[in-house]
Amino acid sequence: MQLMMLGDLKIVRHNSQHYRVLFNTKTGTFIRMEDKGFPEPFWCENGPELIDLSITNYCTRECEFCYRQSNHQGKHLPFIDIQRILKQAKDAGVLQIALGGGNPNQHPQFVEILRLIRESGIVPSYTTNGLGLTDKILQATSIYCGAMAVSFYPPYDQEYYLKLFKKITSYGIRLNLHVILKQDTIEMMTEWLSEAPKLFDYLNAIIFLNYKPIGGTKNFLVKDSNKLKVFFEAADKCKKVKIGFDSCSMSGIVQWMKNVRPEFLEPCEAARFSAFISEDLKMYPCSFMVGTDFYGDLHTQSLKDIWLTSKAFQNFRNRIKTNHCEGCQFDAVCKGGCQFLNEINMCE
């Protein structure tokens, strides 16, 4: 792996795999380019490009749909362990760390964590429930983070969100809104995409996350294909705000969004380009695997060793590579959708 910086542009060259990565550390623009005549890389053999890191499982909202079942008794990841993770992440060539939880900004050493990540040459971001955003934290966010996201909680309180978003963006922070696509949000979001609320004026993008029935109830799953179709078609036509999806939504995107160029589509990146580290130092291909045997233990192995040699990661890569939908016209892009929770796939 070879690294070069041109201003805010980080260029990472993977010679053995015949591709390079262009990552703008200021804007977040990310491009993976294979060499002429070579296929797209299936995974990064050096280490994950992105790590989702849970630095706490503390959260006072205690939502019934929370897949981490975070609560007010949730534990914080010790700072000394975070330091060790960051050293190993830097050695593995990690480009971005997305902090989560729980509510990450309520970790008592959150500002110091942001500073340390950025000083390690890695770009931090985080998702918050909106609580505990002090001026000190927002100032640090504007200095160190590429972006931050606020999670959306129905019912929609316009006054609350407008006040919160005005405060955040007054610091010059690039702000995203994360919305879980589920039974009590899909119709509202379809309306928003057709008739933009004032909220959109403050957003860099709105990111939709497919609901996963982990730790919650399956009643939140949207299984009505007509509702899904109408929503994705509205997203396809929307020009009022930038729109993103998690890769768990791929089966819906390829079916109902016709204006998305294939080079902007990325199927499940778990164990291929990203990994999740829990606050108890277990490293999983995906955060939704917590509580399963699909992990490596950072108490006994290094981050890079787990990435390269762990059976959990090797087996999941193989599952993505081989468990495709034979005869499906979208197979080359979708790669079988979610290989861990088949029930979240939106195939008709």
Where are these regions (language model features)?
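Short, acidic, Ser/Thr-enriched surface-loop or helix-capping motifs
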Residues: 25, 277-280
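Residue-level recognition of short loop/turn positions
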Residues: 62, 101, 279-280
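Iron-sulfur (Fe-S) cluster-binding segments and ferredoxin-like electron-carrier domains
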Residues: 68-77, 290-295, 331-348
